[in-house]
Design a protein with these regions (language model features):
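Long, low-complexity C-terminal extensions of enzymes
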Residues: 190-327
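A short, glycine/Asx- and small/polar-enriched loop/turn
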Residues: 23-29, 154-158, 241-242
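FAD/FMN-dependent oxidoreductases across multiple families
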Residues: 108, 117-233
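Detector for Asparagine
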Residues: 11, 15, 21, 46, ...
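Predominantly flavin-linked oxidoreductase catalytic cores and closely associated redox partners
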Residues: 1-130, 135, 185
Length: 327
């Protein structure tokens, strides 16, 4: 972001949006900021995130997914390395907890970790106690993050769209927000190309059938993407063997009506039907006993077609460190 602001083609306005002027059928001619200025533009992109305390000036409407994905909060804290060579690895560990799961993600400077949990099954204080106990340090004070599993009813409108957490959020497991943001960005590129090729025709504000059809198809595709990721995450909860707390029991009994449809959509999109994928096969592929997903690199690899052992793999820490030295 800081690099983008340095471009002479970018006009950065440090202000807060107080009101969005919305005309018929959702067309936005301008918005008003707290300083009183009116900002006009051809197209607006809402990236305000999911801060529940921020006023919804874009009047976004959401469908809740909270009855399917039960987690609603996370406590997070950065940990220092105690033995970087042993703790630094190129994957995230997802560890089950009593009322959710904990992620452990090594970065270059620190270890990112947090506990995603359901506030309907445990209080924040109880979650912090469980989190700090699992870490082994009761003195730390983690930050508390609120979120709501939900998806925007209409990602793309006449001359605006929502992207990132402003468009919706599921939960941190598998970081689906990254993939979904990439999907919306890709579609936005296509829509802008169509939009500006028709923009001189002012009828696009109210009555441009081609543009309307494009938006309808794009919005339906985004909804299917969110539905697929929802069932993908839910599958990992359902195939986990934990049944020792009310949270895991409740998550096991969540309705799963969209799974068959999601599999059909996946097959249609990826042509996986050639591999005869089904529910059980996919469940065994993406879920382990305790939702601990990681793929440690073996020291030696012996492919069946090779008679000689390949040389040992370079340690991930040494590999990344070589890039830092190159800088």
């Amino acid at each position: 972001k800081k690099q983008a602001f340095k471009s002479p083609k970018v006009n950065f306005i440090p202000d807060t949006v107080s009101h969005v002027n919305i005309e018929g059928q959702g067309y936005i001619p301008s918005l008003v900021v707290e300083s009183g200025d009116i900002i006009e533009a051809d197209y607006f992109v809402n990236t305000t995130g999911q801060n529940l305390k921020v006023k919804n000036v874009f009047n976004e409407q959401y469908d809740s997914i909270g009855d399917t994905l039960l987690t609603t909060k996370a406590v997070v804290y950065p940990l220092p390395y105690t033995n970087k060579r042993e703790q630094f690895h190129p994957y995230t560990v997802a560890k089950t907890m009593k009322n959710g799961w904990r992620w452990i993600t090594p970065t270059w400077e620190r270890i990112g970790t947090g506990y995603t949990f359901s506030e309907n099954h445990i209080s924040v204080d109880q979650a912090i106690d469980e989190f700090t106990t699992d870490i082994g340090d009761k003195s730390i004070v983690p930050n508390v993050v609120d979120f709501r599993p939900r998806v925007n009813k209409q990602t793309f409108k006449v001359n605006s769209c929502s992207i990132g957490m402003a468009n919706g959020f599921l939960e941190p497991l598998d970081a689906p927000g990254l993939a979904l943001t990439n999907t919306v960005t890709f579609m936005l590129e296509k829509i802008l190309s169509n939009y500006y090729s028709n923009f001189r025709d002012k009828s696009i504000k109210t009555n441009n059938n081609y543009h309307s059809i494009t938006l309808t198809l794009a919005n339906e595709a985004i909804k299917k993407s969110y539905k697929f990721w929802t069932t993908f995450i839910l599958n990992q909860y359902k195939t986990c063997h934990r049944l020792d707390t009310p949270f895991w029991i409740d998550q096991k009994h969540v309705k799963w009506d969209d799974w068959t449809l999601a599999i059909k959509d996946l097959n249609a999109y990826c042509d996986l039907h050639k591999n005869d994928y089904d529910v059980m096969m996919l469940a065994q592929t993406i879920a382990s006993r305790n939702i601990q997903f990681y793929t440690p690199v073996p020291k030696e690899i012996k492919p069946p077609q090779l008679s000689e052992t390949l040389p040992p793999t370079q340690h991930h820490l040494d590999y990344i460190e070589s890039f830092h030295k190159f800088k």
